[in-house]
């Protein structure tokens, strides 16, 4: 038995309480005491590791023991809860971006609509695609047949028929070819794009040969089925063949099964599926006899394409495993393979068409010149009497007259009628689909039609036009009556142009070539009348078959898109699986109904289809009773059932949200004849790694736990998925040497990414994994702080605690309930505080007030009901570190940076954690290359600022984006500024518009250029890549580097990622709040940093655009052009605003433009001069004054703009631009309903335009030589310290502090570059004058000499040594020449460095640990490896830079030159632009562009001279157009184009955000009622929610109403009942503190059952409720039980103490004898009882707990813990009896005092006898573990006997 020391902190000030526990959880002492040596050295792994452990040192000083004993006794006597302190102080309501109930309800409705729309669209598009292709196949099969059509063309006869010639039917062969080739052509285009613009692998010869063979066979089978089978079969039969395409998958399915106890049953079902699919060989159907066996061959060849999806790497057959691994390699080179195979498959389809179609259609007809052009068709009507013939002739003549009068309205009595009537016979144009019924022709009728056709052709050649009436009864001998001659194509086009609205609707042509066809078209009559029949010749609509192809291809693509969308948003069951099952049955229903209607109504569907086009229906009428009795239909039913079984994986999806298509589908292409079935078979069967709960262990679990189980059983459990909601059958995993040993979930660098040239991009495919736990998401939360306020610190800490709570719920769900959560992650938090130390009067560092402020906020941020455990503290090479264990057992490390030891600033803090977390923990500790790659891809760094506020759901959304795309290097969320004041209001609108338009545009058309450091998620594999982290650690050398590297470090890091080929995305659904600058000066200083760094990074990106476009798939040359345009608009923005103000003043006040120019120029010129000559405070003061004046002037601009609109009209360019901008903002706000309030400060934004877009850029560029931070510049060092030790300030970590007089600060809002036409700017401080530089340098040199002398004197006085040689050198240095003085200055710097090093060595770097409150923390020492890492890291990258006057002067000169160059170019460009526009405006009459829209019409009266000397007034109408200067017109069009691009990109981005939100929304109504779920399903579906309720603390986690408090009270009161903590997997207990009690109490039920775990202590819920009603008013002032050091331990107590029977009895008594049915609520909601009060839930939890933890000797652990608990029972059991009255209260206080005295005495006794007792326990339990099964009973008896004796002694 081993012992471990844990720290527990009681509420209130004072040191911590130290307890020593044995490995089995028994408390042996209550204070720190020297333990036996054999107990101090051993520390085997533990299973429970929620608290960090510290192995006791070999020697514990007596002073430490006495101090600990005194502290513990003082805590025992202290009163934790004062009964009179019942009043509560509630924290203020959080200023958060709330999503209320209405919003959640709206999401529920929206998801329901999406479900319905997806189902209907997928099902409808799949049915339409199949039916449209089948109708094309039916049209091909009609060649040479005479079919019946709708009698609307010749209504005089009840039956109309038409003969379909082969030439007319040839177009359907080409239509079928196009239909099946379009998906292949799209696949070719996609593969070609990936091959050209992405780095993809090419196939080897064997790989290409295998894929080539398979795809060729598949293409031949598909082509043969379409061209040889479908045109000759009945439509229902052809539709049924879609379910017989699974033969090869059915054969591979049983070969891919893994070993499990369900394997026999699965093999039986697989065999049935094989028999069903093989029955296609004997299926007869309606296929012609010669094609009998050909159907089975075609379906078999088609099904071979999906073999890759049905071979599994975990198969029990080695051959199947080999092919599975080979298939994974094939998928990596799929793009380059299909660049060749897609065109090849189109050639195979063409070969099949020419091979199987010519028996029906000759080659000559297939190769005709225009197969899709207009064709002639003859409509016949037989068996007509004379009256019917006369009626037909009269109708035709009337149509001719009508057509003639429409063309020649001026001719009243035509001498000869024009016979061009062919397109005027039918009413309406020919539609895409027209009616037509097929009727098999008789042989006699075919002969007669041929003879009539020959005679008719001869007659037509003899005579054109005229009406010859035939009276003979023999139609074969007499000349028929003919209608007018059909017009030529030219004439028909002319008639169409004249507006004729009557078109021909049938299709016919003779068997002749193109020349004969032209001649025939000119000679064929429109109609012919015979003795008993008539003929009507008409032209069809051109390209009608092409339109049908487009409909079919569009349906296929729509089906594919909907299916992919359903899989991405986790709606696969409804959006894909259900349509796959129902598509063919619904299609059969529709066809059966249509065929039945067609048999009775020939005009059925005539409005939607061509007259002659219809499916080939069965000859016999369709009846459902006969349908299911026929053998082919029964076989089809077997096919359908077998396909449902083969595609059962569609109903069990395991993919993550928003997964890429490469992760969802194997091949990616689709077959046009059966789109949904090809998608179903192509959908991946294993799209996510199977992760076991035993493998999901954190890194500390792996270090503490391990080893085999005690009973030697290595079998594990397959766990339920919390996402799917279905219980997976438990199956043992194969025995493996690593089974049972948790794997360290650390991360590693990607070694394969070292060069970047040989990196293989598999499109997001998951490779072979060394361990399934390596794919678990791990998040490092890294926050940088400087001088944040207490409120800002509290917001950031509360966000971390929320993340801690969420992670703990998911961890406990998979740890205790054995449910694997797909969103599970591991996280660890780090906070880096810059300049955390200040010097005291002795020159020793100690933490400043901000560190103390942060420590005070820790307990406050945790909650008001609990305090954190005692943290650990240590001294490091960079200062110090404080390590906390959060309430839900995750770790938080606070790194205190000493600027004398390490460089300060945010960028260097980021370099610290990049190298520590990714370099040290990954590269140094993980050696396997594949594991490094996998861990690096699944490890992320969440960067935070010290004032950010966010929810865990926002982090999940960013992780979803990371999982979707492996090439995604960073993702950022939507930043919301918070605070108060006008500046915050302005920033809210600015942030909103910037995110809505600018960031969304960057995301859609390229990459986001800046992922703000206040809330962003970075991928580790991207950060550790070449030229990223290493280049990020580069020290600034050039002036441009100081602007790019240090002023905008977040943007620069994203630039490095883009240049390396990674993508940066923006997630609008992930919200984070941050404090924005509230003052004018702070805002200007912040933007003074942002604008130059933004421009510098954009310029750097544009310089390297060739490399970025080449390596980055997301950046194109068009995106580079967009950024170039935006850069130009930013530079010319101030000039544009200047001109706008000048024009507005001129119009508003009706003054000359020159005077308005002078008015505006004067203040702007004064401000520019001030920025170049005066100090920062003067500049900011003048900026406020001028900005206020311009804001007041902007009110006149509003009037001027209104007048301009009234003058120029609503269609003027200025009006259009203004309304477009306002409309885009308003519509964007409507699409962001939760952010609509951000649109309200629009007026303030308008008033601030001159200040923010004209003055701010000038201020930023004029102060470009100032590189201070500018925000939160509070003095952090006391005046005494700075006065005495001013020289130490020179030893900071950067050279930048010497370039200005202000302290560095930290970025509060890390979001840059917002959407506006003009970019914002930043604020620098004033540069020193050139004349002052030399004087300052001389003074600095003299001060340094004096300082060195003082330091030498100080060392001599303190007895720390004296160096006379140094003084001699200093004296000699003053007398040297100028050259010698320079050399001496360098030597002085070296000597100063040595002195500085000695100073650091002489400092007491550990003394601060003895100060308050650090002396109460637990001191530890870093391990040697980490200490060595920090020393080497600081020495190489982070060593403080010593001051160098020459270097400082050089950099300052460079910054001044950079400032002068940029300002000169900036002012020159804007001045030239202003002059050009103003001159063009003044000379607008000479050089202008007339605006075509909105001409102005003016009416004037003029005096006109009349006859006789009299004048009169006349009206003159003058139309004028706006005259625009060319430059202004170009800029308006330019900005409109940018706005249109941004608006369009915003729409697409909103759709992506909608997809993300829908995928993350859980539909409440989709969950089955609780009473309908089994107990296992209840736990599996709601595991995380159950854990949240069990680990919740009332009053902390949610604000409950009184009814909800009553409902949750039994659960909350249960936490006060003590129960042994280690009841899990039989390993030792870590954190079970069992304090003593003075009197006997508690429940003695603990008997061990032979079949289950011992019953936990039963809690009297009715008594608890009564006590709760008495003490409820006092609970507001009580603190949480300090014995529960983490809420994770509280959850464990509640989990093992749950009892469904006690809760049932409690509810029975509380409801007047009526038992409440808590399961009848149906769904989980706010008004429903918590899940943990549901008796079925508790019963399921009990059953699962007993099953999971009843293994071997584990079942005896609870009994031992309960027996030993009687020795030291919890004193909290009596707390519920307090508060009944004052007298009883005073009596209890006396009893409590006696009890505490007894506790002290017992504690002293236990301190003395603790080691012996613990040693005895270890011996007994050691024998129990070593003994066999026969000896354990005896040993257990001895243990019980010993425990009973110990219990008596304790009593």
Curated annotation (Swiss-Prot):
TM stretches of this protein: 109-129, 169-189, 209-229, 235-255, 262-282, 292-312, 338-358, 545-565, 574-594, 632-652, 1125-1145, 1155-1175, 1180-1200, 1210-1230, 1236-1256, 1462-1482, 1528-1548
Q: Which reaction does it catalyse?
A: [(1->4)-N-acetyl-beta-D-glucosaminyl](n) + UDP-N-acetyl-alpha-D-glucosamine = [(1->4)-N-acetyl-beta-D-glucosaminyl](n+1) + UDP + H(+)
User: What is the enzyme's class at the highest EC level?
Assistant: transferase
Post-translational modification (record)? May require proteolytic cleavage for activation.
Cellular component terms, GO, for this chain's entry?
plasma membrane
Annotated Gene Ontology MF terms? Answer: chitin synthase activity
Where is the sequence biased in composition, kind Low complexity? 466-478
Question: What is the annotated signal peptide range for this record?
Answer: none
- Effect of a null allele: RNAi-mediated knockdown causes a delay in egg hatching.
Q: What is its EC number?
A: 2.4.1.16
A family per Pfam? Chitin_synth_2
Task: Give me the stretches of Basic residues compositional bias.
Answer: 455-465, 1823-1834
For the region Disordered, what residue ranges are annotated? 1-21, 432-522, 693-718, 1350-1402, 1626-1658, 1765-1851
InterPro entries in UniProt: Chitin_synth, Nucleotide-diphossugar_trans
The places in or outside the cell where this protein is found are:
Cell membrane
Q: Which CDD domains match?
A: Chitin_synth_C (cd04190)
**Membrane topology summary:** Multi-pass membrane protein
Instruction: Locate the compositionally biased regions of type Acidic residues.
Output: 513-522, 696-711, 1364-1373
Q: Which residues lie on this side of the membrane: Extracellular?
A: 130-168, 230-234, 283-291, 359-544, 595-631, 1146-1154, 1201-1209, 1257-1461, 1549-1851
What role does it play?
Required for the synthesis of chitin.
The UniProt entry's sequence similarity note says: Belongs to the chitin synthase family. Class IV subfamily.
Per its record, how is this protein called by name?
Answer: Chitin synthase
Q: What is the lineage of its organism?
A: Eukaryota, Metazoa, Ecdysozoa, Nematoda, Chromadorea
């Amino acid at each position: 038995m081993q012992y471990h020391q844990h720290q527990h902190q009681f509420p209130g000030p004072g040191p911590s309480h130290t307890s020593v526990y044995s490995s089995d959880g028994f408390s042996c002492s209550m204070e720190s005491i020297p333990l036996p040596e054999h107990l101090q050295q051993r520390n085997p792994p533990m299973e429970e590791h929620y608290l960090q452990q510290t192995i006791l040192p070999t020697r514990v000083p007596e002073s430490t023991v006495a101090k600990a004993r005194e502290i513990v006794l003082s805590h025992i006597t202290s009163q934790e809860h004062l009964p009179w302190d019942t009043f509560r102080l509630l924290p203020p309501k959080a200023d958060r971006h709330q999503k209320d109930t209405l919003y959640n309800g709206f999401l529920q409705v929206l998801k329901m609509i999406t479900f319905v729309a997806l189902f209907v669209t997928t099902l409808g598009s799949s049915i339409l695609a199949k039916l449209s292709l089948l109708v094309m196949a039916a049209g091909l099969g009609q060649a040479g047949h005479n079919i019946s059509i709708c009698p609307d063309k010749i209504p005089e006869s009840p039956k109309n028929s038409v003969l379909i010639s082969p030439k007319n039917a040839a177009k359907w062969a080409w239509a079928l070819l196009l239909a099946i080739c379009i998906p292949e052509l799209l696949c070719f285009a996609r593969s070609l794009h990936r091959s050209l613009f992405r780095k993809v692998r090419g196939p080897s010869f064997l790989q290409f040969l295998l894929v080539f063979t398979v795809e060729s066979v598949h293409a031949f089978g598909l082509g043969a089925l379409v061209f040889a089978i479908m045109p000759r079969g009945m439509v229902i039969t052809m539709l049924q063949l879609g379910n017989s395409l699974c033969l090869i998958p059915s054969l591979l399915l049983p070969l891919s099964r893994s070993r499990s106890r369900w394997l026999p049953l699965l093999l039986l079902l697989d065999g049935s599926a094989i028999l069903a699919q093989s029955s296609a060989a004997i299926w007869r159907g309606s296929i012609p006899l010669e094609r009998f066996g050909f159907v089975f061959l075609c379906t078999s060849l088609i099904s071979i394409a999906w073999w890759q999806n049905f071979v599994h790497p975990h198969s029990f057959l080695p051959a199947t495993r080999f092919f599975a691994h080979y298939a994974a390699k094939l998928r990596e080179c799929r793009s380059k393979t299909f660049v060749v195979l897609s065109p090849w498959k189109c050639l195979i389809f063409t070969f099949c068409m020419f091979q199987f179609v010519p028996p029906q259609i000759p080659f000559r007809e297939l190769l005709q010149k225009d197969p899709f052009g207009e064709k002639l068709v003859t409509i016949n009507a037989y068996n007509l009497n004379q009256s019917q013939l006369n009626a037909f002739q009269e109708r035709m003549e009337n149509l001719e007259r009508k057509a003639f009068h429409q063309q020649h309205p001026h001719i009243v009595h035509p001498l000869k009628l024009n016979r061009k009537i062919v397109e005027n016979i039918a009413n309406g144009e020919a539609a895409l689909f027209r009616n037509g019924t097929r009727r098999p022709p008789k042989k006699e009728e075919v002969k007669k039609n041929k003879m009539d056709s020959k005679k008719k052709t001869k007659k037509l050649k003899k005579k054109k036009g005229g009406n010859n009436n035939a009276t003979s009864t023999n139609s074969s001998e007499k000349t028929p009556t003919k209608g007018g001659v059909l017009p030529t194509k030219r004439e028909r086009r002319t008639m169409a142009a004249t507006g004729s609205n009557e078109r021909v609707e049938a299709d016919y042509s003779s068997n002749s070539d193109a020349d004969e066809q032209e001649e025939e078209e000119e000679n064929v009559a429109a109609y012919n009348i015979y003795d008993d029949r008539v003929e009507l010749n008409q032209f069809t609509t051109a390209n009608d078959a092409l339109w049908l192809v487009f409909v079919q291809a569009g349906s296929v693509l729509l089906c594919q898109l909907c299916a992919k969308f359903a899989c991405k948003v986790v709606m696969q069951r409804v959006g894909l699986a259900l349509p796959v099952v129902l598509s063919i049955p619904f299609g059969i229903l529709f066809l059966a109904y249509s065929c039945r209607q067609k048999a009775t109504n020939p005009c059925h569907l005539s409005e939607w289809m061509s007259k002659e086009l219809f499916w080939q229906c069965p000859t016999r009428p369709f009846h459902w009773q006969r349908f299911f009795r026929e053998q082919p239909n029964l076989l089809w039913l077997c096919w359908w059932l077998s396909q449902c079984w083969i595609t059962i994986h569609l109903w069990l999806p395991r993919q993550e949200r928003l997964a890429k298509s490469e992760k969802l589908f194997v091949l990616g292409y689709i077959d046009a004849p059966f789109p949904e079935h090809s998608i179903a078979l192509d959908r991946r069967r294993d799209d996510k790694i199977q992760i076991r709960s035993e493998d999901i262990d954190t890194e500390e679990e792996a270090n503490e736990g391990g080893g085999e189980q005690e009973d030697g059983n290595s079998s594990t459990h397959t766990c339920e998925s919390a996402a799917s909601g279905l219980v997976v059958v438990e199956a043992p995993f194969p025995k493996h040497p690593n089974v049972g040993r948790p794997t360290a979930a650390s991360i590693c660098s990607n070694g394969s990414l070292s060069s970047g040239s040989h990196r293989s991009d598999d499109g997001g495919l998951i490779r072979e994994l060394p361990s399934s736990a390596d794919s678990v998401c791990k998040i490092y939360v890294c926050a940088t702080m400087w001088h944040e306020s207490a409120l800002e610190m509290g917001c950031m800490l509360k966000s971390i605690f929320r993340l801690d709570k969420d992670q703990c719920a998911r961890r406990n769900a998979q740890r205790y309930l054995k449910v694997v959560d797909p969103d599970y992650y591991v996280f660890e938090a780090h906070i880096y505080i810059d300049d955390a130390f200040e010097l005291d009067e002795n020159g020793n560092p100690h933490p400043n007030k901000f560190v103390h402020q942060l420590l005070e906020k820790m307990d406050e941020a945790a909650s008001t009901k609990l305090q954190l455990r005692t943290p650990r503290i240590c001294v490091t090479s960079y200062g110090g570190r404080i390590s906390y264990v959060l309430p839900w057992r995750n770790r938080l490390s606070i790194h205190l940076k000493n600027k004398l030891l390490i460089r300060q600033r945010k960028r260097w803090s980021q370099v610290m954690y990049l190298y520590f977390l990714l370099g040290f923990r990954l590269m140094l500790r993980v050696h396997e290359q594949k594991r490094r790659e996998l861990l690096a891809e699944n490890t992320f760094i969440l960067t935070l600022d010290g004032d950010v506020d966010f929810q865990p759901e926002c982090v999940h959304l960013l992780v979803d984006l990371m999982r979707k795309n492996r090439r995604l290097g960073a993702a950022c969320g939507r930043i919301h500024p918070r605070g108060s004041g006008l500046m915050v209001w302005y920033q809210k609108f600015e942030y909103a518009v910037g995110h809505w338009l600018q960031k969304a545009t960057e995301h859609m058309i390229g990459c986001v250029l800046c992922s703000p450091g206040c809330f962003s998620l970075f991928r580790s594999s991207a950060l550790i890549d070449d030229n990223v982290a290493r280049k990020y650690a580069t020290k600034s050398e050039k002036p441009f580097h100081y602007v790019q590297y240090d002023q905008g470090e977040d943007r620069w890091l994203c630039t490095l990622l883009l240049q390396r080929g990674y993508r940066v995305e923006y997630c609008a659904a992930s919200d984070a709040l941050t404090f924005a600058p509230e003052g004018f000066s702070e805002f200007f200083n912040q933007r003074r940093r942002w604008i130059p760094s933004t421009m510098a990074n954009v310029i750097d990106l544009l310089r390297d655009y060739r490399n970025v476009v080449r390596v980055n798939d997301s950046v194109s040359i068009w995106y580079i052009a967009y950024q170039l345009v935006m850069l130009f608009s930013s530079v010319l923005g101030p000039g544009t605003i200047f001109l706008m103000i000048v024009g507005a003043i001129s119009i508003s006040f009706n003054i000359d433009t020159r005077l308005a120019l002078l008015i505006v120029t004067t203040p702007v010129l004064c401000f520019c001069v001030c920025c170049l000559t005066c100090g920062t405070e003067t500049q900011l003061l003048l900026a406020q004054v001028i900005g206020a004046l311009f804001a007041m002037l902007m009110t006149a601009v509003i009037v001027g703009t209104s007048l301009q609109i009234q003058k120029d009209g609503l269609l003027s360019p200025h009006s259009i631009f203004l309304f477009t901008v306002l409309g885009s903002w308003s519509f964007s706000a409507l699409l962001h309903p939760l952010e609509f309030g951000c649109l309200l400060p629009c007026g303030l934004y308008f008033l601030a335009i001159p200040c923010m877009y004209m003055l701010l850029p000038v201020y930023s560029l004029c102060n470009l030589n100032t590189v201070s931070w500018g925000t939160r510049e509070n003095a952090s060092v006391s005046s005494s310290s700075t006065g005495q030790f001013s020289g130490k300030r020179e030893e900071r970590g950067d050279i930048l502090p010497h370039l200005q007089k202000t302290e560095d600060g930290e970025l509060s809002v890390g979001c840059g570059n917002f959407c506006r036409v003009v970019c914002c700017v930043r604020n620098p401080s004033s540069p020193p004058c050139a004349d002052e530089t030399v004087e300052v340098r001389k003074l600095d040199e003299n001060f340094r000499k004096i300082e060195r002398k003082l330091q030498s004197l100080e060392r001599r006085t303190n007895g720390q040594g004296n160096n006379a040689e140094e003084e001699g050198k200093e004296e000699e240095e003053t007398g040297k020449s100028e050259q010698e003085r320079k050399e001496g200055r360098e030597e002085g710097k070296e000597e100063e460095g040595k002195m500085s090093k000695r100073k650091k060595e002489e400092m007491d770097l550990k003394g601060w640990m003895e100060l308050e409150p650090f002396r109460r923390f637990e001191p530890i020492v870093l391990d040697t490896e980490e200490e060595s890492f920090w020393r080497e890291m600081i020495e190489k990258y982070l060593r403080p830079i010593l001051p160098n006057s020459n270097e400082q002067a050089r950099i300052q000169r460079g910054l001044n030159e950079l400032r002068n160059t940029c300002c000169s170019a900036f002012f020159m460009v804007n001045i030239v632009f202003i002059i050009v526009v103003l001159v063009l405006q003044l000379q607008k009459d000479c050089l202008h562009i007339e605006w075509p829209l909105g001409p102005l019409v003016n009416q004037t009266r003029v005096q006109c001279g009349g006859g006789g000397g009299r004048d009169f007034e006349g009206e003159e109408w003058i139309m004028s157009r706006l005259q625009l200067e060319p430059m202004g017109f170009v800029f308006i069009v330019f900005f409109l184009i940018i706005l249109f691009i941004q608006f369009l990109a915003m729409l697409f981005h909103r759709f992506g955000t909608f997809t993300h939100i829908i995928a993350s929304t859980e539909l409440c109504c989709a969950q089955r009622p609780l009473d309908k779920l089994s107990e296992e399903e209840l736990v599996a579906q709601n595991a995380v929610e159950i854990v949240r309720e069990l680990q919740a603390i009332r009053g902390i986690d949610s604000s409950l109403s009184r009814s909800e408090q009553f409902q949750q009270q039994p659960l909350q009161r249960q936490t006060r009942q003590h129960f042994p903590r280690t009841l899990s997997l039989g390993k030792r207990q870590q954190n079970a503190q069992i304090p003593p009690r003075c009197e006997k109490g508690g429940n003695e039920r603990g008997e061990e059952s032979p079949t289950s775990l011992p019953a936990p202590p039963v809690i009297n819920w009715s008594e608890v409720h009564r006590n709760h009603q008495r003490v409820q008013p006092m609970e507001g002032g009580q603190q949480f039980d300090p014995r529960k050091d983490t809420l994770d331990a509280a959850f464990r107590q509640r989990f093992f103490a749950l009892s469904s029977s006690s809760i049932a009895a409690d509810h029975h008594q509380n409801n007047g004898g009526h038992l409440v049915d808590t399961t009848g609520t149906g769904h989980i909601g706010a008004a429903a009882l918590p899940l943990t009060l549901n008796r079925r839930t508790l019963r399921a939890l009990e059953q699962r707990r007993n099953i999971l933890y009843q293994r071997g000797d584990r079942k005896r652990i609870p009994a031992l813990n309960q027996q030993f608990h009687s020795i030291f029972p919890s004193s909290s059991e009596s707390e519920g009896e307090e508060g009944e009255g004052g007298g009883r209260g005073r009596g209890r206080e006396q009893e409590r005092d006696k009890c505490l005295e007894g506790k002290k005495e017992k504690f002293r006794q236990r301190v003395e006898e603790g080691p012996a007792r613990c040693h005895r326990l270890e011996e007994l339990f050691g024998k129990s573990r070593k003994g066999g099964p026969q000896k354990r009973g005896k040993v257990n008896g001895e243990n019980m006997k010993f425990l009973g004796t110990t219990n008596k002694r304790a009593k």
